[in-house]
């Protein structure tokens, strides 16, 4: 099933944007792990719509109701299931979409895949709304990892060409990660964040949208976790990252810049530091070699396309009658999904790392 990620951690998301609820089931979560529900709510609140000009005006509390797998503040080891109610749907905004394909959306391809029976309201199962259960699962995984000293953080690296400072690929600390995490608009340099907000608001006023890039870092990941070929760390992270709607690109470490380098420029030279650990002088490899963690920070950048729902007239087709039409999308939509996607990227990386950590000796 395409909505199930089944590895050491089993992870299934279900529901549609305008159905009664969405949810998640996690299998093989270690028993006896203390989970702080307030921290889960805080994590999910970072993904929820903000009451400002940078996000949709759809208002969802995103309060998960845990149905199983959690008792007396701890995981039980049985399937961990959470439901999240949908409470603010405007389904009438989508009344004509059973036959008109929104450019940039999965309406047309979804109709082909599911023979026209797919729920198109709000994007249905393809909606960014499904990142709420992803964030629940990622918040659980993140708490388990942080108890082992592993911290994952992300920030908005770029919005429509306006760039933030990058994480230090060698010396980023958990305090630096927490500082960015606590910001309403998560950039390292606040001045750049303010410029990004202006750019998003400009797109909104122009009845348009913009995309951007999120940078993510994971620190204190033990050297040696992961696998070669098909089950590598990059593979697992990539599968989950591309489960986030609107993601169109992913790079690790120096990424596509390595194509412009020589071997002597790209290679990260090893040495033994003052703590007796094998480390590298640089981190072009992004903390992963051969699908296996090197012990250096894992770094990645994720590209998000502009929100496809824009209020401008666009050419499309009525695929029930096979004729050309013009569509002006109605509804409440983000002029830029990137700010709300920051915890989604963290969640995906948390789940992937926990999945591989379960193979680690003395977990």
Regions found by a protein language model. Give the residues of each.
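Internal helix-turn-beta structural module
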Residues: 10, 307-363
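A short glycine/serine-rich beta->alpha loop
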Residues: 10-15, 118-130, 223-227, 283-288, ...
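Glycine-rich anion/phosphate-binding loop at the beta-strand->alpha-helix junction
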Residues: 14-21, 207-324
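Glycine-rich, N-terminal phosphate-binding loop and its surrounding beta-alpha-beta segment
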Residues: 44-103, 107-109
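Short acidic, glycine/tyrosine-flanked loop/strand segments centered on an H-E-D-like triad
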Residues: 98-124, 315-333
């Amino acid at each position: 099933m395409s909505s199930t990620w089944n590895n050491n951690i089993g992870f299934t998301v279900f529901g549609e944007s305008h159905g009664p609820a969405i949810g998640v089931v996690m299998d093989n979560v270690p028993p006896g792990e203390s989970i702080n529900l307030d921290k889960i709510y805080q994590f999910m609140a970072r993904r929820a719509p903000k009451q400002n000009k940078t996000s949709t005006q759809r208002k969802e509390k995103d309060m998960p109701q845990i149905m199983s797998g959690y008792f007396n503040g701890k995981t039980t080891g049985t399937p961990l299931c959470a439901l999240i109610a949908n409470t603010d749907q405007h389904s009438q905004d989508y009344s004509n979409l059973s036959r008109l394909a929104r450019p940039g959306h999965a309406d047309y391809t979804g109709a082909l895949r599911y023979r026209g029976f797919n729920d198109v309201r709000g994007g249905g199962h393809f909606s960014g709304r499904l990142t709420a259960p992803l964030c629940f699962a990622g918040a659980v995984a993140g708490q388990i990892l942080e108890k082992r000293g592993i911290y994952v953080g992300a920030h908005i690296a770029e919005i429509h060409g306006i760039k933030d400072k990058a994480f230090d690929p060698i010396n980023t600390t958990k305090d630096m990660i927490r500082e960015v995490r606590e910001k309403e608009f998560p950039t390292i340099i606040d001045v750049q964040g303010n410029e990004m907000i202006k750019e998003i608001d400009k797109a909104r006023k122009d009845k348009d949208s913009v995309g951007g890039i999120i940078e993510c870092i994971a620190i204190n990941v033990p050297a040696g976790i992961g696998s070669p070929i098909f089950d590598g760390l990059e593979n697992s992270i990539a599968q989950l990252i591309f489960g986030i709607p609107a993601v169109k690109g992913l790079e690790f470490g120096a990424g596509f810049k390595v194509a412009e380098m020589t071997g002597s420029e790209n290679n990260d030279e090893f040495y033994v530091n003052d703590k007796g650990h094998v480390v590298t002088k640089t981190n072009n490899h992004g903390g992963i070699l051969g699908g296996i963690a090197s012990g250096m920070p894992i770094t990645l950048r994720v590209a998000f396309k502009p929100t496809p729902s824009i209020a401008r007239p666009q050419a499309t087709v009525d695929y029930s009658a096979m004729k050309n039409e013009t569509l002006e999308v109605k509804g409440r939509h983000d002029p830029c999904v990137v700010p709300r996607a920051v915890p989604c990227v963290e969640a995906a990386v948390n789940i992937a790392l926990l999945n591989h950590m379960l193979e680690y000796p003395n977990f």
